[in-house]
Curated annotation (Swiss-Prot):
Catalysed transformations (reactions): S-ubiquitinyl-[E1 ubiquitin-activating enzyme]-L-cysteine + [E2 ubiquitin-conjugating enzyme]-L-cysteine = [E1 ubiquitin-activating enzyme]-L-cysteine + S-ubiquitinyl-[E2 ubiquitin-conjugating enzyme]-L-cysteine
Modified residues annotated as N-acetylalanine in this record: 2
GO cellular component terms given for this protein: cytoplasm; cytosol; filopodium tip; nucleus
Protein's name according to its UniProt entry: Ubiquitin-conjugating enzyme E2 K
Summary of subunit composition and partner proteins: Interacts with RNF138/NARF. Interacts with BRCA1.
Residue ranges constituting the UBC core domain according to the UniProt record: 4-154
Compartment(s): Cytoplasm
Domain UBA positions: 160-200
Source organism: Homo sapiens
Modifications made to the protein after synthesis: Sumoylation at Lys-14 impairs catalytic activity.
Signal sequence residues: none
């Protein structure tokens, strides 16, 4: 990796470690390799959102051209959010694309992602199914996002009604993750979710 990128990432890595947000357990970053080309980030689900109480792991890859080009970031932890793919963890956020500026830092990225969890942009979605639910049925979206936060990010327990539907389909022999995705994308309708599971 180019020397300028390494020096910059080392400095930013230390900045995150010393930050007030890290001391409050809001953001975190760890090295994956000694070259500073791959990092593991973590953000806490913001208060008063369906993600509250969850911890979200992020894969952060630093390009050779950093800081002139943004890091490549994706969610490792599964999440139900209009701007994050429920399948791949890919993120739709302008600062990770054309609005990136060389003055931005790892800390900026982590805090921006945390802010995105609190303020979704459903009209610029990464996941159309989630965005549609967010706009058409906000209460169901919140319950679904909360359930995903519980199952995948360790947030406190969520909707007993949704949990029962998951258990019933799992008892039929379907894979738990596949069941959660099918029910979530089919508005928690057991019949259409079952049809989807049988067609895969």
């Amino acid at each position: 990796m180019a020397n300028i990128a390494v020096q910059r990432i080392k400095r930013e890595f230390k900045e995150v470690l010393k930050s007030e947000e890290t001391s409050k357990n809001q953001i975190k970053v760890d090295l994956v390799d000694e070259n500073f080309t791959e990092l593991r980030g973590e953000i806490a689900g913001p208060p008063d959102t369906p993600y509250e109480g969850g911890r979200y792991q992020l894969e952060i890859k630093i390009p050779e051209t950093y800081p002139f080009n943004p890091p490549k970031v994706r969610f490792i932890t599964k999440i139900w959010h209009p701007n994050i793919s429920s399948v791949t963890g890919a993120i739709c956020l302008d600062i990770l694309k054309d609005q990136w500026a060389a003055a931005m830092t790892l800390r900026t990225v982590l805090l921006s992602l945390q802010a995105l969890l609190a303020a979704a942009e459903p009209d610029d979605p990464q996941d159309a199914v989630v965005a549609n639910q967010y706009k058409q049925n906000p209460e169901m979206f919140k319950q679904t996002a909360r359930l995903w936060a519980h199952v995948y990010a360790g947030a406190p327990v969520s909707s007993p009604e949704y949990t029962k539907k998951i258990e019933n389909l799992c008892a039929m022999g379907f894979d738990r993750n596949a069941v959660i995705v099918a029910l979530s994308s089919k508005s928690w309708d057991v019949e259409t979710a079952t049809e989807l599971l049988l067609s895969n």
